[in-house]
Amino acid sequence: MDCSICTTMPSILRPPRNTICGSCYEGARTTIALLKKLEGSKEDRHDKSNHNSTINNGSSISSSPLFSCEPQPLEKVIKWMKNMKETEEEQKKRIVFLSSFVSGFKEQLHADILLKPGDDGPPIPAHRALLASKSEIFKNILDSDGCKTAPEYAITLQELNSEQLQALLEFLYTGTLASDKLEKNVYALFIAADKYMIHYLQELCEQYMLSSLDISSVLNVLDVSDLGSSKTLKEACVGFVVRNMDDVVFSDKYEPFSQKNQHLCVEITRAFLMETRSKRRD
């Protein structure tokens, strides 16, 4: 079929030269649908903002036509894509600007507190303001009278060794962590993130553990999830064990795990029996 969009030589098309093939048609529909979906989510947030403004100010803000969910022409998609490109470039500049603070950590510029690992490793200089802004628990610790009056004050994180503490601080300063460091320290970082209420790090560790869950790791992850407060992670692990009962229970890791975590074994047994009962009913 003649297509005025994907052909490389539009001059050879037969009149009226405005037909498109099925692939281009579906592509255009999908693109416009995506734009409407994104603008719909923006409109929801905009409406919530208007509602809050009405409550606080006694007046409402009219809805912007930019967020209209009415059918839009394909040409608006091009404008949206250009705006997204500009937004992406702006975000890159912002990341570069914010990452300059990392040099303060690496070069120990004007550090005003020490963090000590639990393995008697050397203390690591850090900045109180950053710790307090990233963790409500750190903020409460730093607000204590003893910590305020002692510039050389050191906080000991007993649950982390030197390498794990370094990884934690690297994440706090940069908002990211190399995949090899995350893989090696994910369990310790998850527990620390839960303890010190560093929610973004906790979510990152949880997503990594869920994405890499397998026979060899599920018991370790289940153990860690029980120490933390992630119900989602714990339920995912129990469900994985139930679906792979033979492989997990007869593995070398299960006996020491069962001796250490009898309550988790009870949960696994109950979940397995409920799953078996459900299958029998079906």
Swiss-Prot record:
What are the protein's UniProt keywords?
Answer: Ubl conjugation pathway
Region annotation (Disordered) maps to: 40-66
Q: In which pathway does it act?
A: Protein modification; protein ubiquitination
Q: Where is the composition biased (Low complexity)?
A: 51-64
> What InterPro entries does this protein's entry cite?
At1g01640-like, BTB/POZ_dom, SKP1/BTB/POZ_sf
Keyword Repeat annotated: no
Which residue ranges have biased composition labelled Basic and acidic residues?
Answer: 40-50
PROSITE patterns for this protein:
BTB
Q: Name one GO biological process term.
A: protein ubiquitination
Question: Where do the BTB domain residues begin and end?
Answer: 111-181
SMART domains, alphabetized: BTB (SM00225)
Q: Which domain of life is it from?
A: Eukaryota
- Entry comment, domain topic: The BTB/POZ domain mediates the interaction with some component of ubiquitin ligase complexes.
Role this protein plays = May act as a substrate-specific adapter of an E3 ubiquitin-protein ligase complex (CUL3-RBX1-BTB) which mediates the ubiquitination and subsequent proteasomal degradation of target proteins.
Q: What is this protein called?
A: BTB/POZ domain-containing protein At3g56230
Q: Give the organism's phylogenetic lineage.
A: Eukaryota, Viridiplantae, Streptophyta, Embryophyta, Tracheophyta
